[in-house]
Amino acid sequence: MKNDNQTLKRTMTSRHIMMMALGGAIGAGLFKGSSSAIDVAGPSVIIAYLLGGIILLFIMQGLAEMAVRNRNARTFRDLVQQVLGNYAAYFLDWIYWKMWVLNIAAEAVVAAIFIQYWLPGCPIWVLALGISLIVTIVNLLSVKIFAETEYWLAMIKITVIIIFIILGLLLLFVSFGDHTASGFSNLTDHGGFFPHGGTGLITAMLVVIYSYGGTEIIGVTLAETKNPEKVVPKAVRSTLTRIVAFYLLPFFIIVSLIPWNQVNSVPESPFVMVFKMVGIPGADHIMNAVILLAIISSMNSGLYGSSRILYTQASDGRLPKVFSKLSSKNVPMFAILMCTSSLYIGVLISLFAGSQTFNYLMGSLGYTVLFIWLIIGFAHLKSRKQQTETPAYYVKWFPYTTWFAIVALLAILIGVIMTTSIVITGITAAIYLLITVAYLVKGRKHQ
């Protein structure tokens, strides 16, 4: 164990950060949550993901601008604290930590569900436990090993989604064998493009925002990234490409090929359903394996992000110093182990709730991403007032883009509160209240 004076090293390169930005949001929200989004919105889910993607782009641009102006920032907590104060930074830190620890717990269960495709008789909790142990070990080895693992897992995800798009377009436009080109009739049949009206679209936004959550993890890598002032803006510029390639096109293909009201009637991911339609032997197994890797990749990133939040809090004296201690591999070992506890809580919940565990956790996570993006948006607005010179990277259409994102997020938040289960809303509100009380009782002492 190294002494307390050791700090995190800048070992992640541009290619690591670029791939984390590209693949960071490709996880359970896309592959498993997609069924829920389509079920409530129908074909209009395409509009929901387009709107969510535009909001994401504007928020990420603001994050990149703030990162460029403050090269010494370790995470986006430091960026927010400078402009919005101690409480906002404290609140952001803990809801972001809560988001990731619940997310990795949810994704451990989802990964187990996909493994059950091959091992239907094996209990979910056993499979979730095995996956949790693997992800823990990868994060404990070293930052370089984590970054390389994440790089190749993200590469696999991206490659397969590209293959999915190509095969999906062939199914839409080309007839072969027993398959007849599907066309676009499913977009308007079965109740129309908006089968549940505007309510369905608004309800789907919670899943959409959750699906996009994770992209902002590049704001947690600042202390371990070489030249973050150059790398982060470069990663953000790829956001629009990611939105179109990894969300809009796949969802357009899914709701065009499969009647929207049949997507949630089977336990399989709609991505696996499309691969089955191709008729290639074993195609569904290949897609299932790739989805499994994608979810493990997202868990990997989540454990990284949540452990760095604990490390930063401990380094600043807000948590016990043990969480700031680094191992011989220069990773915050105790912070990682603390965060893995959520994985095993997820395993315990799955022992009783089974496959429904993911749905229970996803609603609260959607709320959290909304609040995280709102805080980043408000921080960007205020940071411009403190700016004395134009940074190397800046948002050209400021403040219109940032205000659009904030107003849209507030509208979505109101709509989601009105359409989401009161249980999920109540639990989330209770967690936020607990964080606020903790700050008032204890957090102020360390400011």
Swiss-Prot record:
Superkingdom of this protein's organism: Bacteria
Deletion phenotype: No growth phenotype is observed for the knockout strain.
Membrane disposition: Multi-pass membrane protein
Entry keywords, A to Z: Amino-acid transport, Cell membrane, Membrane, Transmembrane, Transmembrane helix, Transport
GO biological process terms on file: amino acid transmembrane transport
Gene Ontology molecular function: any one: amino acid transmembrane transporter activity
Inducing factors: Induced in response to leucine limitation. Regulated via the T box transcriptional antitermination system.
GO cellular component: membrane; plasma membrane
Segments passing through the bilayer: 17-37, 40-60, 95-115, 118-138, 154-174, 200-220, 243-263, 289-311, 333-353, 361-381, 393-415, 419-441
Pfam families for this protein: AA_permease
Family: Belongs to the amino acid-polyamine-organocation (APC) superfamily.
UniProt-recorded name of the protein: Uncharacterized amino acid permease YvbW
Organism: Bacillus subtilis (strain 168)
Taxonomy of the source species: Bacteria, Bacillati, Bacillota, Bacilli, Bacillales
